[in-house]
Swiss-Prot record:
Source organism of the structure: Granulibacter bethesdensis (strain ATCC BAA-1260 / CGDNIH1)
Domain TRAM: 420-482
Protein name: tRNA-2-methylthio-N(6)-dimethylallyladenosine synthase
Sequence ranges assigned to domain MTTase N-terminal in this UniProt record: 35-155
Reaction equations catalysed: N(6)-dimethylallyladenosine(37) in tRNA + (sulfur carrier)-SH + AH2 + 2 S-adenosyl-L-methionine = 2-methylsulfanyl-N(6)-dimethylallyladenosine(37) in tRNA + (sulfur carrier)-H + 5'-deoxyadenosine + L-methionine + A + S-adenosyl-L-homocysteine + 2 H(+)
Gene: miaB
Lineage of source species: Bacteria, Pseudomonadati, Pseudomonadota, Alphaproteobacteria, Acetobacterales
GO cellular component, one term: cytosol
Residue ranges of coiled coil: none
PROSITE patterns: MTTASE_N, MTTASE_RADICAL, RADICAL_SAM, TRAM
Subunit structure: Monomer.
Length: 493
């Protein structure tokens, strides 16, 4: 399963850490022998987490985060392979970075250039062949070895490490220096925490099993220790990450294998951790105890990203999803019975090879039947090496365009209706960042909507009741009610 909610902008590690307790940016005077590191992050939330951990790995070598590529002693491009033309986008960016490297060389200041992430894993040899100025190519399972790779590169070696190592990288990564915050959210009030990596599902369209490997789960003790450090650093909401996160099966502190639900129950006991989320999930791994966790644990937010991809049983079989539309309906109904205020988001692919008009109409009917608060939708794009790419019954581009427009129009209508239904409700919002206007602050609703209101900045980091006054395409406006009590969360459905 690919992670979703893809970040469409380029993010640097310094952007993530600028307001954190251990932040170092380009505005901070460099210590003696300090080297400046700029990390460009493309793709999913796990890549954001990985970029921060690579920064931690390089810290003992004297590297600190630098806000801009200009002036950096090392640049890491952390890549994503999910969308179309991913490889060519990487080479385009590398061409830009090459100019910076050459300019630094003319000044007698060498710069290391590394390519990490899923494109590096899939195209490692090609990157070295087409971009001879790249010093290091490393896949997602070798980040714990990055320090050694840097030493080799500084001695003139061109390094490529894309094999899956026998050791588990989670056993060797250093402790996180600071919370890994969500993009654009100040103060580290929200954090990403990877607990599981890889996928064993092998959907026909997906490269993740080939770039991230088999499913691996972190020991519960490691997850809990990092979560406690994040909370001590100011995090009040933690999102648990995994390519197939609800397949989590880490070794527990009692020696038993823990499920995701059991891990969430342990996390809920951490003082001052107000909110827990997880992404991305597979419908086949929504277990009875996970449904019970949604019913029983108030810290577990009533918002779930549950990709379905298609509403056609025939296409679901072609995708190797190993569930039917009816299976998905049953899971959704059970979740909503357990947590009536639960809102859903999902992923949809239109134009998978062999998709007919009737298959597409099945998808539209599924969307109408379920109702989504938000969703991500894409045209099918063949990924080299995947079974779907080898098929010869591809859907014409104009047909995919028309289907995507119809599907997105329906999803947009549902999202607007969900947001509009919030008007007049009082909901708990975690306030996380100053707003774009003076006197304004921003936060997150339980359903992951951005919420903006006029309120003092001293409230940042708190979860407070607000009254929703207006709905916009991607956000809500709110005011602080006159009442002092902390109300129960109310559904906007």
């Amino acid at each position: 399963m690919p992670m979703t909610g893809l970040l469409q902008t380029t993010l640097s590690t310094a952007d993530q850490d600028r307001s954190g307790p251990a932040a170092t940016t380009g505005d901070t005077p460099a210590r003696a022998n300090t080297k400046r590191l700029h990390v460009i992050t493309w793709g999913c939330q796990m890549n954001v987490y990985d970029s921060a951990r690579m920064t931690d790995v390089l810290s003992p070598l004297g590297y600190t985060a630098h806000a801009e590529p200009e002036g950096a002693d090392m640049i890491v491009l952390n890549t994503c392979h999910i969308r179309d033309k991913a490889t060519e986008k990487v080479f385009s960016e590398l061409g830009r970075l090459r100019l910076l490297k050459e300019a630094r060389a003319r000044e007698g200041q060498p710069m290391l250039l590394a390519v990490a992430g899923c494109v590096a894993q899939a195209e490692g040899e090609q990157i070295l062949a087409r971009a001879p100025y790249v010093d290091i190519v490393l896949g997602p399972q070798t980040y714990h070895r990055l320090g050694g790779m840097v030493r080799r590169a500084m001695n003139g070696e061109r390094v490529i490490e894309t094999d899956f190592p026998p050791e588990d990288k989670f056993d060797y990564l250093p402790e996180a220096a600071a919370p890994q915050h969500g993009p654009g959210l100040a103060g580290g009030r929200t954090a990403f925490l990877t607990i599981q990596e890889g996928c064993d599902k092998f959907c026909s369209f997906c490269v993740v099993p080939y770039t991230r490997g088999a499913e691996v789960s972190r020991p519960a003790s490691s997850v809990l220790a990092e979560a406690r450090r994040m909370v001590r650093g100011g995090a009040r909401e933690i999102t648990l990450l995994g390519q197939n996160v609800n397949a989590y099966h880490g070794l527990g502190e009692d020696g038993e294998v823990w499920t995701l639900a059991r891990l969430i129950r342990a996390l809920a006991d951490i003082p001052d951790l107000l909110r827990i989320r997880y992404t991305t999930s597979h419908p086949r791994d929504v277990s009875d105890d996970l449904i019970a966790a949604h019913r029983d644990i108030p810290q577990l937010m009533p918002f779930l990203h549950l990709p379905v991809q298609s509403g056609s049983d025939r296409i679901l079989a072609a995708m190797n999803r190993r569930h039917t539309a009816e299976d998905y309906f049953r899971v959704v109904d059970r979740l909503r019975e357990a947590r009536p205020d639960l809102a859903l988001s999902s992923d949809f692919i239109v134009g998978h090879p062999g998709e007919t008009d009737e298959d597409f109409e099945d998808t539209m009917r599924l969307i109408e039947r379920v109702g989504f608060a938000q969703a991500y939708s894409f045209k099918y794009s063949p990924r080299p090496g995947t079974p779907a790419a080898e098929r010869d019954n591809h859907v014409p581009e104009p047909v995919m365009d028309e289907r995507l427009q119809r599907l997105q129009a329906l999803l947009r209508t549902q999202q607007e209706a969900f947001n509009t239904a919030c008007i007049g409700k009082t909901v708990n919002v975690l306030l996380v960042t100053p707003g774009r206007h003076p006197g304004q602050i921003g936060g997150r609703s339980p359903w992951l909507q951005a919420v903006h209101l006029d309120a003092p900045a001293t409230l940042i980091g708190q979860e407070v009741p607000v009254t929703i006054t207006a709905a916009h395409t991607n956000s809500l406006s709110a005011t602080l009610p006159d009442c002092a009590p902390h109300p129960k969360e109310l559904t906007c459905a």
